[in-house]
């Protein structure tokens, strides 16, 4: 891996963070097994803070030491560079932050698995969150990318989020986050720690039926038998990225250990031993061919994290 970053004025910034922050702190931690697609190099330092106080200490430390901070949720929708990630990679553990219920509002920790949010909702007799049943990753990551399906998205149910910075933490209304298709605007350096969902009382049995139908549809149309980060490109207005990638003859096309799925052409599957460079080669090829044939510039939905070579990113920029 590339040499670990060094913080200004500190011979070993990692030792300083280890000293200040309570929780799990791992040097040169492999990230591939912590992502859905099982690709990527190590983090200089991977931190899972023990509690909100430990997170506050971490955020102050990275600011004072000028160390980059990358937030990694459940590893879905993420491609980590083969060279890894410099600085600190932050993961919030499940159960991080106090949970609460007030009528139709649930407050849950950002580390909660997205696909299991319905369990908390149904236990409270609430519905309206059926779309999350098949979404991998964590609640915080789902909010950050406004994750969703054809039956709903996070902006439909999020009413407020708690943001932590080096200066403190507090709830902000969802309206201030500028939710849009597969994105939202988070303040620089802010970490989502808790999320307030506003749902509605309803028929839990009917909600379960809707979720099961959605799961069944995903199993039929998505490559869930191999590691994948989910949709690679966002759908352009009035069309579907998978249709376009298939139309230019790339469905099932392979580079190294990665392939465009022969089940759904907007999904890249790891056949075993894939590298980030393999995945990026597939993405560049698809974007180039679609642009040449249809005049459409596909936009990446997957989040690129870490130290990528400039040549690997050529052809992926707008």
Curated annotation (Swiss-Prot):
GO molecular function list: FAD binding; UDP-N-acetylmuramate dehydrogenase activity
Gene Ontology, cellular component aspect: cytosol
Primary site of residence: cytoplasm
Pfam families according to UniProt: FAD_binding_4, MurB_C
InterPro entries in the record: FAD-bd_PCMH (IPR016166), FAD-bd_PCMH-like_sf (IPR036318), FAD-bd_PCMH_sub1 (IPR016167), FAD-bd_PCMH_sub2 (IPR016169), MurB (IPR003170), MurB_C (IPR011601), MurB_C_sf (IPR036635), Oxid_FAD_bind_N (IPR006094)
Pathway listed: Cell wall biogenesis; peptidoglycan biosynthesis
Basic and acidic residues composition bias: residue spans: 214-223
The reaction(s) this protein catalyses: UDP-N-acetyl-alpha-D-muramate + NADP(+) = UDP-N-acetyl-3-O-(1-carboxyvinyl)-alpha-D-glucosamine + NADPH + H(+)
EC number annotated for this UniProt entry: 1.3.1.98
Gene3D superfamilies referenced in this protein's UniProt entry, alphabetically: 3.30.465.10, UDP-N-acetylenolpyruvoylglucosamine reductase, C-terminal domain (3.90.78.10), Uridine Diphospho-n-acetylenolpyruvylglucosamine Reductase, domain 2 (3.30.43.10)
Presence of the UniProt keyword Cell division in the record: yes
Source organism superkingdom: Bacteria
UniProt KW keywords: Cell cycle, Cell division, Cell shape, Cell wall biogenesis/degradation, Cytoplasm, FAD, Flavoprotein, NADP, Oxidoreductase, Peptidoglycan synthesis
Domain FAD-binding PCMH-type, chain residue ranges per copy: 39-202
Intracellular or extracellular location(s): Cytoplasm
Residue ranges of the region described as Disordered: 214-235
Matching NCBIfam families: murB, PRK13905.1
Functional note: Cell wall formation.
The name this protein goes by in its record: UDP-N-acetylenolpyruvoylglucosamine reductase
């Amino acid at each position: 891996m590339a040499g670990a970053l060094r913080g200004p004025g500190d011979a070993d910034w990692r030792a300083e963070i280890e000293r200040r922050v309570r929780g799990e702190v791992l040097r040169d931690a492999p990230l591939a097994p912590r992502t859905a697609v099982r690709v990527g190099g190590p983090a200089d330092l991977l931190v899972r803070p023990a509690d909100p106080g430990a997170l506050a200490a971490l955020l102050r430390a990275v600011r004072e030491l000028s160390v980059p901070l990358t937030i990694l949720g459940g590893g879905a929708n993420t491609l980590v560079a083969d060279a890894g990630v410099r600085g600190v990679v932050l993961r919030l553990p499940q159960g991080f932050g106090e949970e609460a219920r007030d009528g139709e509002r649930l407050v849950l920790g950002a580390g909660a698995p997205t696909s299991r949010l319905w369990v908390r909702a149904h236990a409270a007799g609430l519905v309206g969150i059926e779309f999350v049943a098949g979404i991998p990753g964590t609640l915080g990551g789902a909010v950050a990318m406004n994750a969703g399906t054809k039956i709903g998205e996070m902006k439909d149910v999020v009413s407020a989020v708690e943001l932590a910075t080096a200066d403190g933490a507090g709830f902000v209304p969802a309206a201030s986050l500028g939710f849009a298709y597969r994105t939202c605007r988070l303040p620089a350096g802010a970490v989502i720690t808790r999320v307030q969902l506003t749902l509605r009382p309803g028929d839990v049995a009917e909600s379960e039926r809707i979720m099961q139908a959605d799961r069944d549809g995903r199993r039929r149309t998505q490559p869930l038998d191999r590691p994948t980060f989910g949709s690679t490109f966002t759908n352009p207005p009035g069309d579907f990225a998978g249709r376009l990638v298939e139309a230019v003859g790339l469905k099932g096309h392979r580079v190294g250990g990665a392939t465009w799925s022969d089940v759904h052409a907007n999904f890249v599957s790891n056949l075993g031993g894939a590298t980030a460079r393999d995945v990026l080669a597939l993405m560049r090829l698809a974007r180039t061919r679609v642009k040449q044939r249809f005049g459409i510039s596909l936009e990446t939905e997957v989040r690129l994290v870490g130290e990528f070579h400039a040549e690997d990113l050529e052809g992926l920029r707008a």
